Curated annotation (Swiss-Prot):
Domain commentary: The HXXXXD motif is essential for acyltransferase activity and may constitute the binding site for the phosphate moiety of the glycerol-3-phosphate.
One of the record's GO molecular function terms: glycerol-3-phosphate O-acyltransferase activity
UniProt GO BP: CDP-diacylglycerol biosynthetic process; phosphatidylglycerol biosynthetic process
Cellular compartment(s): Plastid, Chloroplast stroma
E.C. number: 2.3.1.15
Major location category of this protein: plastid
Family of the protein in this entry: Belongs to the GPAT/DAPAT family.
Keywords for the protein's UniProt record, in alphabetical order: Acyltransferase, Chloroplast, Lipid biosynthesis, Lipid metabolism, Phospholipid biosynthesis, Phospholipid metabolism, Plastid, Transferase, Transit peptide
Short sequence motif HXXXXD motif: positions: 241-246
UniProt transit peptide range: 1-102
GO CC field: chloroplast stroma
Organism: Spinacia oleracea
Annotated catalysed reactions: sn-glycerol 3-phosphate + an acyl-CoA = a 1-acyl-sn-glycero-3-phosphate + CoA
Protein name, UniProt field: Glycerol-3-phosphate acyltransferase, chloroplastic
């Protein structure tokens, strides 16, 4: 397991051996070039980004000891400024070591495979010679079969070539990281060059999405949000969380009309997605605020203090980013992925943690920038459903399928408007949280009727207008 430190974190440096690999996609005949790279660690220099996404259990854990009560706005502002100043001082530029003496060249095991049989054979060989842990090799082989079956079921042309190309690069990235594990700093910026991990993740998930049966709700509001971001405002998206593919799904559905949002989201990532060997390459392609989840904080008692210090640093990063303005934050106030009802098997948005939601609201209020909170719904569990139960061990089984997906947003919900008439802060917190959850749940049901109920855009309601912006 990788452990995040509260000291100055390492950063990815790139050197040597640029190798291109062409990718086919289900929606275009164009290909994307990826470079095989050699990684080496060094001290990081300060970098910036614009958009953030997080899960509430992690946010609450970070914020509980840092946020004041709503009646202590003066001390809140002081604490806020102090935290931001601390981050600025800690992240001063540090000279980095030259890479001229690094002569290590990595073998690209999978880049030249020509068939599924050859790829599986290479996985087995790597395991036999000890370069690949047996558990990872087993997971790789299983993932390949699930992915291949899902893409083949889509009926897209050149499906076998797409599968082989995407899986070859993905498995090379996995092997590369096993040889020299990448350690995520508290704030990780997506790796876009010379190897474009973001585009790799998009191209990998793209063939799993049935765009003919996928929808965006209220595309005009996404346009409105981009305008607010350009004005320096902060935006919060209170959302449900369906699968590990959520980031790619959001970006795929918005990439044509809202590339600002699609390409620059930052996600708060627990230790699961930054330590699981099969998940790390996808995480490396996203902007992440790395924290330890409350659910797994006490898995190893000896690491509790280290994890808490890492979370404190991540909170400081969040404070500084918000203070800079023009940030959009995706947060899942349920604290984790949605799960089906144990009796009916029906999926629905997980219940929101109102305290975590309120922590985020107050962070935004004290940022010194205008802030707007929107309810957002996601439906995409079919393409990569989570395990039925929350698992303690790293390395969950990943089942995949080709299916329609959806994302929808409704107009912002103002705290002061909704809480008007409430007798106290606790009642206001509950009323506001419930209003956001109800909106997410209603939008989810519209997406469900359109995608699962096969009603298409006919499932639109007066408050949720469905469209397919990529088709226009």
């Amino acid at each position: 397991m990788l452990v995040l430190s509260s000291s100055a974190p390492p950063v990815l440096e790139v050197c040597k051996d640029r190798v291109s690999s062409s990718f086919s996609t289900s929606s275009s005949s164009s290909s994307s070039a990826f470079s095989a790279v050699v990684f080496r660690r060094s001290f990081f220099t300060r970098f910036n980004s614009s958009l953030i996404c997080c899960c509430s259990s992690k946010l609450k854990l970070m914020a509980d000891t840092a946020l004041p009560s709503s009646s202590s706005s003066t001390s809140a502002s002081a604490s806020y400024s102090a935290a931001a100043k601390s981050v600025e001082e800690e992240n001063h530029e540090i000279p980095v070591k030259k890479e001229d003496d690094n002569q290590l060249l990595r073998s690209r095991t999978y880049r030249n495979v020509r068939s599924a049989e050859e790829l599986i054979s290479e996985i087995k060989r790597e395991s036999e010679i000890g370069r690949l842990p047996k558990s990872v090799a087993y997971a790789m082989e299983g993932l390949f079969h699930y992915y291949r079956n899902a893409v083949l079921s889509s009926g897209i042309s050149h499906a076998d070539e797409i599968v082989l190309s995407n899986m070859s690069v993905m498995l090379d990235f996995v092997l590369l990281d096993i040889e020299d594990p990448f350690v995520f700093p508290p704030f990780h910026k997506a790796i876009r060059e010379p190897a474009d991990y973001y585009s790799f993740g998009q191209d990998y998930i793209r063939p799993l999405v049935d765009f003919g049966n996928s929808y965006v709700g209220n595309i005009a509001i996404f346009q409105e949000m981009e305008e607010k971001l350009k004005q320096g405002d902060n935006i919060i998206l209170m959302s449900n969380h369906q699968s590990e593919a959520d980031p790619a799904v959001i970006a795929l559905l918005l990439e044509k009309t809202n590339s600002l949002i699609a390409e620059n989201l930052i996600y708060i990532a627990g230790d699961r997605v930054i330590t699981d060997p099969l998940c790390k390459p996808f995480s490396m392609g996203r902007n992440l605020l790395c924290v330890y989840s409350k659910k797994h904080m006490y898995d190893d008692p000896e690491l509790v203090d280290v994890k808490k210090r890492a979370n404190t640093r991540s909170l400081k990063e969040l404070v500084l980013l918000l203070r800079g303005g023009s940030k959009i934050i995706w947060i899942a106030p349920s604290g984790g992925r949605d799960r089906p009802d144990a009796v009916t098997g029906e999926w629905y948005p997980g219940t929101f943690d109102f305290a975590a939601l309120d922590n985020m609201r107050r962070l935004v209020e004290h940022a010194g920038r205008p802030g707007h909170i929107y309810p957002l719904a996601l439906l995409c569990y079919d393409i990569m459903p989570p395990p039925a139960q929350v698992e303690k061990e790293i390395g969950e089984k990943r089942v995949m399928s080709f299916h329609g997906v959806g994302v929808s947003v409704e107009p912002e919900i103002n705290y002061n408007d909704v809480s008007l008439g409430c007798k106290n802060d606790e009642e206001a917190k509950s009323v506001y949280g419930q209003a956001l959850y109800n909106s997410v749940n209603e939008q989810y049901n519209v997406l469900k009727a359109a995608i699962h109920g096969k009603q298409g855009s006919g499932a639109s309601t007066p408050t949720t207008s469905l469209s397919q912006p990529w088709a226009s």
